[in-house]
Amino acid sequence: MAFGKSLFHAIGRVSLVRQIAAGLALGIVIGSVSPQLGLAAGLFGSLFVGALKAVAPVLVFILVAATIAQHQKGNKAHIRPIIVLYLIGTFSAALTAVIAGMVFPTHIVLAGAGDVSAAPPSGIVEVLKSLLMNLVANPINAIANANYIGILAWALVLGAALRNHGSDVTRQVVADLAEAVSTVVKWIIRFAPLGIFGLVSSTIAETGFGALAGYAKLLAVLLGCMAFIALVVNPAIVWWKIRRNPYPLVFTCLRESGVYAFFTRSSAANIPVNMALAKKLGLHEDTYSISIPLGATVNMGGAAITITVLAMAAAYTQGIQVDFATALLLSLVATVSACGASGVAGGSLLLIPLACSLFGISNDVAMQVVAVGFIIGVIQDSAETALNSSTDVLFTAAADLGRQRNRAE
């Protein structure tokens, strides 16, 4: 018993990042050496992601409602500058992907469209309609289905009603509930090393690395664009806001948010992680409690890259030459589509046919491109989610720190 306690204390003294690194390394070894054991270990990953996904909608609803209910008149949440950064970042990602697609034209071997079961949206109007319908969804269904647009809308309405008509005791109860749910999130995050060990070992056991070799160039363009956004474009945007070296903040967000998101492959599951990081960075709670769940829905730079690169690859594969004007239009369509990706089953991949329609590519061919996306999804989706989710907290921090700098001046 004493040995067990001392072991837990020793593990507790090791930083969470190092524990995650150890879990990652062990997962790679187990998944490679013993696929059967790796698949069995996948249960830990499923439990970890399931717990995060389960608590995230409740956390967002209660935290946003509590924040609005306790919001004092005269205090501003300063959400608008963050939304502007989200849109700039997403459009920059789409434009970067267009340029990369023209500089490194990629031809792909089309996979069978039968591998894709879901139906893509018929047009941009359907994407926007889906977003608006999510806004007025039943609040219980919104929480149950992790519909964050609906959750945000109802939390804002309930919080405003409590602020104007609730008693001090009622508002305090909601605040205590928010604190309790935040504590539960901290407990879940402590199991991240075990969860990531399970996710990595099962992924490698299931797919290995051979399935990705045939699409190496396509993956290189996708990952290159995402790395360029994460390490060049985003830091430039952050510098514009805070006017000092952005890289310490950028690397903190990538390390403490991007790593989790890469392995969970879920922006929703990463919301509690981003909330905890925002609190650690000392950001304004009235701001990040709204901007981070909103970012998980509309800040989709990684999705814009995926849509653009695969649509251009489809065009080149069909022998279609892409002129700059069409490419620029593709950037705009990809930006709007990416912002609606969370409202579409299948996310960014099923918005590819919408982008392909700009080039007159048939739906049959477009769905084969989507099937290719699912083949490389083990890497593409992980990198996309890491970029999307880490950028949520990065831009929130940049806007908040920029506001503090302006106030100091």
Swiss-Prot record:
Membrane topology: Multi-pass membrane protein
Alphabetically ordered keywords of this record: Amino-acid transport, Cell inner membrane, Cell membrane, Membrane, Symport, Transmembrane, Transmembrane helix, Transport
Any Gene Ontology biological process: threonine transport
The name this protein goes by in its record: Serine/threonine transporter SstT
CC annotations in GO: plasma membrane
Family to which the UniProt record says this protein belongs: Belongs to the dicarboxylate/amino acid:cation symporter (DAACS) (TC 2.A.23) family.
Transmembrane segment boundaries: 24-44, 48-68, 82-102, 142-162, 194-214, 218-238, 292-312, 319-339, 365-385
An example Gene Ontology molecular-function term: neutral L-amino acid:sodium symporter activity
Pfam short name (any one): SDF
Gene3D superfamilies: Sodium:dicarboxylate symporter
PANTHER family: PROTON/GLUTAMATE-ASPARTATE SYMPORTER (PTHR42865), SERINE_THREONINE TRANSPORTER SSTT (PTHR42865:SF8)
Main subcellular location of this protein, as a coarse class: membrane
Reactions accelerated catalytically: L-serine(in) + Na(+)(in) = L-serine(out) + Na(+)(out); L-threonine(in) + Na(+)(in) = L-threonine(out) + Na(+)(out)
Keyword Transmembrane helix among record annotations: yes
Domain of life, per lineage: Bacteria
Subcellular location: Cell inner membrane
UniProt function note: Involved in the import of serine and threonine into the cell, with the concomitant import of sodium (symport system).
